[in-house]
Design a protein with these regions (language model features):
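Short beta-alpha junction loops
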Residues: 62-63, 90-97, 171, 189, ...
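C-terminal interaction surface of TIR/SEFIR-family domains
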Residues: 205-242
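An anion/phosphate-binding loop that grips the pyrophosphate of nucleotide cofactors and donors
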Residues: 161-162
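Hydrophobic alpha-helical transmembrane segments
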Residues: 2-32
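N-terminal topogenic membrane-targeting module
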Residues: 34-130, 134, 138
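Structural alpha-helical scaffold elements that stabilize or flank donor/cofactor-binding regions
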Residues: 157-158
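Conserved TIR/SEFIR loop-to-helix hotspot centered on a Trp-containing motif
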Residues: 171-185, 189
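IQ-motif-like calmodulin-binding regions
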Residues: 145
Length: 242
């Protein structure tokens, strides 16, 4: 979209410049814009890897907005070039994941219909996830909107269809019951699953270790990430791509 906007502005300036001399014929300067969507579709097809793209599930300690947003900007955006991202919606990443479809749905009053109201809603909601590449070659971030009574069922379903999990436990403490449940669910998953866990000096590793004591050996890979620097970003991406 940004690429198209830049070219649109440049061509519009040229069209307006020559319009005084040739009149409406100056609009011909805008014709190259017709080729941009086609070219981007061809580019996306050429980049498409064979087989099913991997799915990344992102979990985190809520109310750690600044750290989670930094992680999203530096890591998740890079992952989107290779595979899908799914997460349980929260206000901490609203400005990172909001797209035009979300805005129009909200304005039309249809946002409530996206919420998972019962366990029976989980399968249809996951079946409706958009897992295709966009025209710019990136995969989308799909969110599941849940109530307090349904997020656990949604989590179990998301774990069942994810290939790798990124769990940001920076600042995690024993009283974070939701994170403890997530850790237990990941540890109990019957399918092959890689879990990359981020921690820092405030992470209660003992409480986390207790929650995953029954996990298969090697399932969890811990990374000490005290800040969102370039070296830390490379380490996280290397762990995700395995």
């Amino acid at each position: 979209m940004l690429f198209t906007a830049v070219w649109a502005i440049a061509l519009l300036v040229q069209a307006l410049t020559i319009a005084s001399a040739v009149g409406t014929a100056g609009a011909a300067m805008l014709l190259p814009l017709l080729w941009i969507p086609l070219a981007m579709q061809v580019y996306a097809r050429l980049k498409r890897a064979p087989g099913r793209p991997p799915t990344l599930l992102v979990l985190r300690v809520f109310q750690r907005d600044a750290q989670v947003q930094g992680l999203f900007d530096q890591v998740i955006e890079r992952w989107r070039l290779s595979g899908n991202t799914v997460l349980i919606a929260g206000t901490d990443l609203a400005d990172r994941t909001l797209d035009a479809d979300d805005i129009f749905t909200f304005l039309d009053g249809g946002l409530a219909a996206r919420f998972i109201r019962s366990a029976a809603d989980v399968a249809p909601r996951l079946a409706a996830l958009d897992l295709e590449r966009d025209a710019d070659g990136r995969f989308r971030v799909n969110e599941c909107y849940c109530h307090d009574t349904t997020w656990q069922a949604a989590l179990q379903a998301l774990v069942g269809r994810s290939d790798v999990v990124l769990m940001d436990l920076r600042g995690f403490q024993a009283h974070n019951a939701g994170c403890r449940y997530e850790l237990g669910t990941l540890a109990s998953a019957s399918r092959a699953l890689r879990v990359v866990v981020l921690s820092d000096g405030q992470t209660d590793r003992a409480a986390a270790a207790q929650a995953i004591a029954h996990a298969a050996p090697g399932r969890f890979e811990w990374l000490d990430i005290a800040r969102n620097g370039a070296r830390e970003r490379r380490a996280v991406l290397a762990a995700l791509f395995g």
